[in-house]
């Protein structure tokens, strides 16, 4: 493989879960891209999600954010169907177009409010338009991770597809 490797780190502490277990076909079917999900630790009430890569915050919603790093865009979704909460239980600490480093705080969210609203607290972390074959060094399901721990790597293959 040629190209540079981008490390995608965990935005929250928790347990790694396969995307196939996310109760939303957009993620479980890898329609938006490949990656993993992180299940918040039992008993967690509020968590501050951090940037999984260094880059530019290109989209920020209370329940989700996207960070662009090189040719890749990483989507972090805080819970499933949490768009229906209309921002309740979420506090944003960053602004769109802000330059972020790995570990910079982006959004604090209430796991308690997500679960009270009967939504899944699983947090998918995906690289948009990627496939499982694009990912390397994938952290195994069931592994406990802290914020900033490696989830997986993806290689920038843009130089391989330069003919247009």
Question: Regions from the language model: what does each represent?
Answer:
Residues 1-164:
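Contiguous, well-folded functional domains in the mature portion of proteins
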